Amino acid sequence: MTEQKIDKRVARTKTRLKEGLADLMTRKSIQEITVKELVEYVHINRSTFYLHYSDISNMLENVKRELIEEIAEVMESYPPEPFSEESVVFMKDVFFSLGSNRKLYRSLMGKNGDPSFVQQVEDLVGEKCLTGLKRQFPNEMNMLKYSYRFCLSGCVGLIRSWLQKDPEDSETPEEMADQSFRLIMSVIRETHPRIRR
């Protein structure tokens, strides 16, 4: 068997395991999910699971790391300027990334999810935005930091609500990006009249 075929099989197996884990996490906490339950759910041998992960916790850590790396990659491709026109494009790419792994994000950010993962996402996005704010408005930071924190928490809430909807019934990533940007800018303009972008 060629290496390419093996790689595709491995990718398919990992995708099935991830989707299965996401499904099970909508029903119960990660601590309650066993390897036996997961492999039976996705119809994979237990030995196949152990080729890739040592246990459920190890799998979850790998999944979280992959998702964080994907968001970080999106963020690195944009300059840290929160109120530029590129901000909307950046937000669209973030929402596309979230949408492409919707099941996993929904599970990780849902009621049986992982609060540390939510915090990692918030910290990653927040650091990028804060860097841009400091660069653009060095003399406004004392007050901007409160607006920034308010907007960041609001965006996380917006993302969570969006992820809980069925894809067919929810807004597109473009619509969510536009809505997020408008909400952020309305808060910033209201609280900081000198910022008129």
Enumerate the language-model features and the residues they cover.
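Alpha-helical bundle regulatory/interaction domains
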Residues: 1-37, 41-197
